[in-house]
């Protein structure tokens, strides 16, 4: 599975933080739901000893490459909670294929992205860009990291 496919799979699972329960981890049941999905995906790609603890921390292990067992281990860490900005739990990713460098309308929300406000968009010309439809956050800072780690 490609990282973009994983991002789309994970993005639609709403994991907004609940400020009323900020003292507990996870602060919402949906965060545990995504943790369970991640654990399954980790098992599916061959990680071993995969587990999810009571706080929605997901652990998995990948054995060292043969003849590299002496190398130091490495760990990858990412979080799965997102901001709760729009007060809705329905996340609608939007895919722009072969981005042409112009303004990207975020669905019918009236919001847009452009290279004046976001100059880094110029690097995406000709590529696929994944955004929200403008009615919610995408949560890509968290979930794209997780998707990349598992790809």
Place the predicted regions along the sequence by residue.
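Acidic side chains
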Residues: 14, 41, 53, 81, ...
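Active-site metal-coordination/substrate-binding segment of hydrolases
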Residues: 68-151
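A generic "functional-site adjacency" signal
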Residues: 1-4, 54, 143
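Predominant activation on well-ordered alpha-helical scaffold segments within soluble catalytic domains
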Residues: 4, 8, 36-39, 146-150
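A non-catalytic alpha/beta surface segment that caps or lines the substrate-entry region
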Residues: 22-71, 75
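N-terminal capping segment at the start of a domain
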Residues: 2-28, 131
């Amino acid at each position: 599975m490609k990282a973009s496919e994983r991002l789309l799979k994970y993005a639609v699972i709403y994991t907004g933080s609940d400020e009323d329960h900020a003292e507990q981890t996870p602060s919402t049941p949906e965060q545990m739901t995504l943790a369970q999905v991640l654990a399954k995906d980790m098992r599916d790609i061959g990680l071993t000893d995969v587990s999810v603890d009571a706080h929605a921390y997901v652990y998995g292990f990948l054995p060292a490459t043969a003849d590299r067992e002496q190398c130091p281990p490495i760990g990858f860490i990412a979080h799965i909670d997102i901001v709760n900005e729009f007060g809705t739990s329905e996340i609608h990713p939007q895919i722009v294929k072969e981005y042409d460098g112009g303004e990207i309308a975020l669905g019918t929300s009236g919001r847009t992205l452009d290279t004046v406000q976001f100059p880094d968009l110029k690097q995406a010309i000709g590529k696929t860009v994944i955004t929200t439809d403008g009615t919610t956050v995408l949560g890509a800072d968290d979930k794209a990291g997780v998707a990349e780690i598992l790809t």
